[in-house]
Amino acid sequence: MESCFQGDSRKSYSLSELAEILGAAVRGDPAIRIRGVNSLEDALPDELSFITDVRYKPLLSKCRAAAIIVSPALAELEFPLLVAERPYVVFARAAQLFAEPPFLAPGVHPGAYIGPNVHLGEGVSVGPQAHIGEDCVVGPGTRIYGSAYLGPGVRVGENCMLYPGAVILDRCLLGNRVTVHSGTVVGSDGFGYAQDEKGRHVKIPQTGIVQIDDDVEIGANCTVDRATFGRTWVRRGAKIDNQVQIAHNVVIGEHAILVAQVGISGSTTLGSHVVLAGQVGVAGHIEIGDRARVGAKSGVHHSVGAGEDILGIPGVPAREWKRTYANIQRLARFREELRLLVEKVQRIEKALDGE
């Protein structure tokens, strides 16, 4: 099977070159040429693969890879190796060396719309039917694919990737190396209404912006609402999966991970390295501390301290939830034991009444 991480066929590295670039040690022939990366099962004779656990050693008997990335614990394998403390991280960086972004012709496609007072940096590529509104600034090396939309006054940094159909609405700010995938809308109105005396909903204009810092990646079909005032802020290095909703005035901390279908209500703040697993719901106006983790489908209704693990609906500390769940699993047994105990008490009472 052809590697999905194999780039330009002219791009290749020797094992020793990769070791130097990736900070790994070579075991075996340093002159081996590598032209891509792949899984153990599918790797071709000129590709690099990886193994992180001894459980996968049986796969090596059929592996055709030119070399394998391993941890020091597996450095004695009879195979050309790159040895690193964090083999999975090294594999990810190797994949980046070979991966090529989807093709986009350099320059501005004649079918794109470029508004007045737009500044495009050196090496910017703009695809067909893309729309770049007035007063936008786009940094060098950024790729704006077909049908992407930038509203008036948007600022986009260097080497960003805006995929087809990505929407960045007016005045929003993107840092450097930001990736926004198809169907995502950055800067839609926050959900803000006041109820009058007759129960009618009066819209509160959402006049703030969204600020996305360097090295953020946002998946497909996400929505990041603009602030009521000030900014909704996604801080440096955060990674956001598909179909995530981030409400107005939310702050996402540095290097946070938000897995698919997470929803975060307004004015909530996440610390750095927070992990929200799939379908987590977070109430508004609370704080989740640095390195806290919330398990899938949990509902968080109160602030969470740094380093806490949360599970369940409503979310509680993981140990408490596990104890509760274990007891739920025993309910049928408890019920039967209680029934027998009640019957025993009734027999004793009946015997006592007969004396």
Swiss-Prot record:
Catalyzed reaction equations: a UDP-3-O-[(3R)-3-hydroxyacyl]-alpha-D-glucosamine + a (3R)-hydroxyacyl-[ACP] = a UDP-2-N,3-O-bis[(3R)-3-hydroxyacyl]-alpha-D-glucosamine + holo-[ACP] + H(+)
Membrane-spanning ranges: none
GO terms, biological process: lipid A biosynthetic process
Keyword Glycosyltransferase on entry: no
PROSITE patterns: HEXAPEP_TRANSFERASES
Listed pathway(s): Bacterial outer membrane biogenesis; LPS lipid A biosynthesis
GO molecular-function terms, A-Z: N-acyltransferase activity
Keywords (A to Z) from UniProt: Acyltransferase, Lipid A biosynthesis, Lipid biosynthesis, Lipid metabolism, Repeat, Transferase
Annotated Pfam families: Hexapep (PF00132), LpxD (PF04613)
Active-site residue numbers: H248 (proton acceptor)
Assigned GO CC terms: membrane
EC number(s) given by UniProt: 2.3.1.191
Family: Belongs to the transferase hexapeptide repeat family. LpxD subfamily.
Name this protein carries in UniProt: UDP-3-O-acylglucosamine N-acyltransferase
Lineage, uppermost ranks: Bacteria, Pseudomonadati, Thermodesulfobacteriota, Syntrophobacteria, Syntrophobacterales
